[in-house]
Amino acid sequence: MTTLADLRINYSRASLDEADAAPDPFVQFDRWFKEALAAKLPEPNTMTVATVGADGRPSARILLIKAVDERGFVFFTNYESRKGHDLAANPHAALLFYWIELERQVRIEGRIEKTSTDESDRYFASRPLGSRIGAWASEQSTVIDSRATLEAREKEVAARYGENPPRPPHWGGYRLVPDAIEFWQGRPSRLHDRLLYTRDDAAATGWSISRLAP
């Protein structure tokens, strides 16, 4: 049997140098994201979202990024879920994008704010009908009796709202406003390239760049 200690690959696809990195981390993220799209990676918009609750316990889950601009990184969820309760108690989070085919990671840390009602309404209206019904049917992160209970609730919601379910008051968007963004490029011998962007009001771009030891 193969042991876990024997599982490894050597990274050699690319490098990341300060001279080639964009001065603005949002520009650098856009560059890498477009390269992930061009490489036809499966769901390059998936990310891990890590939160910490009032009890100090961390939790993490996979979500989809839905918008990125100079204000931050936007995702949508149930405000009454575990992550929602965590963020209400501690409005800070970390995101991680992992594009293994490109041997890249992007780590993002910052404070969390809710998106506007209009932003949440517009995105909710753009979702497939089944997803909009599901937002009402699922009391996310609560214990349920069975799959049948969930499906019965789905049918009930579909009958009530038809083709136009409104956005539930417990569902909407969050924006992570970053204060640190790290770009990681795998390199041979585990001597990876790591460039960390941190907020810096004195810098022309509002960000400073540091190289971290792997």
From Swiss-Prot:
It catalyses: pyridoxamine 5'-phosphate + O2 + H2O = pyridoxal 5'-phosphate + H2O2 + NH4(+); pyridoxine 5'-phosphate + O2 = pyridoxal 5'-phosphate + H2O2. It holds the Pfam family PNPOx_N. Its EC number is 1.4.3.5. One of its GO terms (biological process) is pyridoxine biosynthetic process. Pathway: Cofactor metabolism; pyridoxal 5'-phosphate salvage; pyridoxal 5'-phosphate from pyridoxamine 5'-phosphate: step 1/1; Cofactor metabolism; pyridoxal 5'-phosphate salvage; pyridoxal 5'-phosphate from pyridoxine 5'-phosphate: step 1/1. This is Pyridoxine/pyridoxamine 5'-phosphate oxidase. Belongs to the pyridoxamine 5'-phosphate oxidase family. It comes from the Bacteria. It is an enzyme of class 1 (oxidoreductase). Its cofactor is FMN. Binds 1 FMN per subunit. One of its GO terms (molecular function) is pyridoxamine phosphate oxidase activity. It comes from Burkholderia vietnamiensis (strain G4 / LMG 22486) (Burkholderia cepacia (strain R1808)). Homodimer. Catalyzes the oxidation of either pyridoxine 5'-phosphate (PNP) or pyridoxamine 5'-phosphate (PMP) into pyridoxal 5'-phosphate (PLP). Gene3D superfamilies: Electron Transport, Fmn-binding Protein, Chain A (2.30.110.10). FMN binds at residues 61-66, 76-77, 82-83, 105, 140-141, 184, 194. Keywords: Flavoprotein, FMN, Oxidoreductase, Pyridoxine biosynthesis. Substrate binds at residues 8-11, 66, 123, 127, 131, 190-192.
